[in-house]
């Protein structure tokens, strides 16, 4: 193709993303678009076709962003190249959403016509506005008996400030409205900007590791072109490679001769070093270099931390390799080596939330065959010493002694909860029990309210969301953003087994809740630790003060069974000997903590 033909081709490219609150039918609607445009053969079509992980299908959620090229002939006979980027809906994966939006000019905002606008819908709208995207609202699931289109259109106008008359009607189940959606993408979303004659600038928005091809970055070409044989340079790592293959996703890889401005695809260059490819980096030409990199992404900081330890200690290196490979297409994951007296060698790992933590653990188990034990999740605390020094603590066992601490600050979040009006009391009671401060209550309509709370982040990482869902019969939706750090009355609580501190069970608790937490943990451990030949005390302690205790009674062997007759002195002698033996066992005995005890403790909090 000559330059003029490439410029004409660029005018027919449309890059769009699909954003929605979790479970609003986003992946199903994407399936219908792919089916209608003939992108996927009906014979190989399956539900959630863009959700490539088994884990995504099982849970019915999207975890990773996915890109696919669609060819569409519009009603005016013109052929268009569309790049659809499917995104996750869960709050933990909003980073994946922001990455995909940076590769687009427009977005379909999917709203469930039976549920209306939810907390994550709002968050996604703000993200799209920040990225200057054209928003096309789509009311999905209109075939449901409970769908209320006029009411949701009113919400679009009042809550989002968008024109309700421009909202489209669709059903991912039946395929209703797919033609209208495609036509609106063509007319309302602008073609990508970019100059084919400028030096190459390509934004890396994702990457993964292929055992044959090495590291494969997913890219959006902004300026210039790239083809097989080109020498390219990664601007952040300064590493140079020769391109082996370029192509697009359909959703499998399709090899192309070149990629030009507006194209969304992939390149391979036999990259073996995982550290050379960073999401958000810019690829340029080695021979005709761009002066400046593209604006990447706001780096997401991990907010929930826990220790991950291999159940089989000889699998430590496999766990390390697993985390390195997962970090390739999940740049928000961070980890560093750590060791525990109770669990051996492992990694302190940072996540964007509890679901993110759960998904990573499951992927390590499925994709790499390593079973892991996770310690209790915690957040980053700001600890100020009496000398005025500031420490960042993400591991309770690293907290200095009480005498050295002047104050501790913990992160708070601004929570947005949307629920039916009848559940206001239950939501407020739950939030107050979690040390929340009510900020605002706003009625969206006569039945639904939006409640804003200020909550300590450490409180919501333990079962807050699950309790919220069960109290509101699943009708509440929840979104949050990190606010600032505030001073709190926090202390380190140690758990002792047989008089020894188990470092993996230490946690930081608020003074007012220390007794209940300690009592609950001791009771759980008593239930899950098997009996030994000696008595085991389980204690919860704040410093030197024991605040809760449970005792696992010793198993008793009947040492008098072999006696017959009535020789009471012999009986006493044997029982005395057993008593001495148990005393010795108690001082020398080690208590093994089973993995199910760890999991049960996480569930109690």
Curated annotation (Swiss-Prot):
Keywords: Cell membrane, GTP-binding, Hydrolase, Membrane, Nucleotide-binding, Protein biosynthesis. It is an enzyme of class 3 (hydrolase). Gene3D superfamilies: 3.30.70.240, Elongation factor 4, C-terminal domain, Elongation Factor G (Translational Gtpase), domain 3, P-loop containing nucleotide triphosphate hydrolases, Translation factors. InterPro entries: EF-4, EFG_III/V, EFG_V-like, EFTu-like_2, G_TR_CS, LepA_C_sf, LepA_CTD, LepA_IV. It is found in: Cell membrane. Pfam families: EFG_C, GTP_EFTU, GTP_EFTU_D2, LepA_C. GO terms for cellular component: plasma membrane. GTP binds at residues 23-28, 140-143. Required for accurate and efficient protein synthesis under certain stress conditions. May act as a fidelity factor of the translation reaction, by catalyzing a one-codon backward translocation of tRNAs on improperly translocated ribosomes. Back-translocation proceeds from a post-translocation (POST) complex to a pre-translocation (PRE) complex, thus giving elongation factor G a second chance to translocate the tRNAs correctly. Binds to ribosomes in a GTP-dependent manner. This is Elongation factor 4. It comes from Aster yellows witches'-broom phytoplasma (strain AYWB). The lineage of its organism: Bacteria, Bacillati, Mycoplasmatota, Mollicutes, Acholeplasmatales.
């Amino acid at each position: 193709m000559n330059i003029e033909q490439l410029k004409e081709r660029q005018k027919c490219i449309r890059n769009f993303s699909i954003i929605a609150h979790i479970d609003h039918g986003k992946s199903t609607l994407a399936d219908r678009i792919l089916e209608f445009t003939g992108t996927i053969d009906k014979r190989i079509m399956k539900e959630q076709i863009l959700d490539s992980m088994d884990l995504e299908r099982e849970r019915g959620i999207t975890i990773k962003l996915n890109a696919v090229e669609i060819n569409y002939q519009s009603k005016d006979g013109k052929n268009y190249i569309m790049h659809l980027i499917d995104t996750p809906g869960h709050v933990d994966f909003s980073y994946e959403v922001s990455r995909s939006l940076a590769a687009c000019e427009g977005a379909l905002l999917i709203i469930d016509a039976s549920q209306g606008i939810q907390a994550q819908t709002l968050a996604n709208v703000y993200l799209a506005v920040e990225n200057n995207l054209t928003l096309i609202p789509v009311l999905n699931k209109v075939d449901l008996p409970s769908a209320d289109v006029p009411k949701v259109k009113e919400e679009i106008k009042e809550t989002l400030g968008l024109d309700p008359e421009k909202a489209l009607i669709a059903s991912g189940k039946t395929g209703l409205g797919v033609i209208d959606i495609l036509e609106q993408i063509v007319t309302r979303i602008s073609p990508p900007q970019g100059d084919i004659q400028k030096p190459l600038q390509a934004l890396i928005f994702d990457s993964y590791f292929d055992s044959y091809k090495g590291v494969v970055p997913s890219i959006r070409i902004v300026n210039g072109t790239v083809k097989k044989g080109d020498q390219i340079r990664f601007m952040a790592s300064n590493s140079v490679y020769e391109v082996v293959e370029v192509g697009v996703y359909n959703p499998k890889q399709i090899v192309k001769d070149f990629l030009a401005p507006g194209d969304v695809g992939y390149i391979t260059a036999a990259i073996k070093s995982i550290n050379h490819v960073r999401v958000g980096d810019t690829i340029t030409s080695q021979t005709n270099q761009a002066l400046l990199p593209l604006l990447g992404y706001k780096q997401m900081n991990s907010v929930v931390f826990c220790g991950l330890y291999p159940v089989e200690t000889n699998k430590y290196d496999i766990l390390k390799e697993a985390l390195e490979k997962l970090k390739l297409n999940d740049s928000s994951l961070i980890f560093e080596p750590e060791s525990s007296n109770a669990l051996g060698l492992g990694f302190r790992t940072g996540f964007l939330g509890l679901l993110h933590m759960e998904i990573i653990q499951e992927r390590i188990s499925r994709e790499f065959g390593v079973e892991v034990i996770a310690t209790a999740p915690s957040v980053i605390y700001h600890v100020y010493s009496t000398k005025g020094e500031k420490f960042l603590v993400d591991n309770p066992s690293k907290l200095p002694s009480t005498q050295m601490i002047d104050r501790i600050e913990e992160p708070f979040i601004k929570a947005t909860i949307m629920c039916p009006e009848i559940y206001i009391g239950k939501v407020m009671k739950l939030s107050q029990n979690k040390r929340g401060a009510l900020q605002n209550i706003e009625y969206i309509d006569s039945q639904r309210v939006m409640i804003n709370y200020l909550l300590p982040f450490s409180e919501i990482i333990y079962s807050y969301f699950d309790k919220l869902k069960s109290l509101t019969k699943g009708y509440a939706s929840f979104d949050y953003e990190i606010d600032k750090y505030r001073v709190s009355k926090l202390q380190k609580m140690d758990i002792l087994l047989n008089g020894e501190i188990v470092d993996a069970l230490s946690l930081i608790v608020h003074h007012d809740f220390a007794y209940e937490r300690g009592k609950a943990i001791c009771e759980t451990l008593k239930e899950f630790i098997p009996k030994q030949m000696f008595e085991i005390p389980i204690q919860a302690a704040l410093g030197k003060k024991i605040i809760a205790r449970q005792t696992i009674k010793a198993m008793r062997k009947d040492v008098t069974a072999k006696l017959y007759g009535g020789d009471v002195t012999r009986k006493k002698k044997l029982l005395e000997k057993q008593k001495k033996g148990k005393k010795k066992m108690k001082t020398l005995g080690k208590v093994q903590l089973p993995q199910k005890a760890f999991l049960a403790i996480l569930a109690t909090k």
